[in-house]
Amino acid sequence: MDTSRLTLDHFLSRFQLLRPQMTHETLNQRQAAVLIPVVRRPQPGLLLTQRAIHLRKHAGQVAFPGGAVDSTDASLIAAALREAQEEVAIPPQAVEVIGVLPPVDSVTGFQVTPVVGIIPPNLPWRASEDEVSAVFEMPLAQALQLGRYHPLDVYRRGNSHRVWLSWYEHYFVWGMTANILRELALQIGVKP
């Protein structure tokens, strides 16, 4: 599938036509969720954040809004929506949730569920200075081009695992964020 002329309608029909498949058994028990905010435009965008520099984990990294499930969350989707509101001021009622991708294990011990949602183009999002240093929009068509991601095999604690790397403007997109974007591309039928 060629992503260069990806429209929102095409993305939605492909995402809903091909249901996510579980690819592996997850190892982690702690639950987290992220929102993949697709901006409703004829040529859709993808909202991403850069985590604040002062954070203990993943400081300065490009990420989706999201975080750990807490006791007030009724579901993984509710957790993703709450975190998106806390981090970038996206009201939960403004998000049209279209589905979820299979959970991914993080290196920090969480089972992370990506929630795909459509958001209006005119939302006045703003970064929570406690958690986010920047909010930016990337064209979804570019984010879903598999050729932009390059593999790097990392050896950690005697184990090898592959991470994916890419750049968008001056933002370095890698790790779980790049992996989730690749999974989303594969989900809608982009060929490697």
Swiss-Prot record:
Annotated Mg(2+) binding sites: E83, E87
Enzyme Commission no: 3.6.1.-
The name this protein goes by in its record: Uncharacterized Nudix hydrolase NudL
SUPFAM superfamilies linked to this entry: Nudix (SSF55811)
Pfam family, one: NUDIX
GO-annotated molecular function: coenzyme A diphosphatase activity; magnesium ion binding; manganese ion binding
Database matches in HAMAP family: Nudix_NudL
Organism, scientific name: Salmonella typhimurium (strain LT2 / SGSC1412 / ATCC 700720)
Originating gene: nudL
Keywords (A to Z) from UniProt: Hydrolase, Magnesium, Manganese, Metal-binding
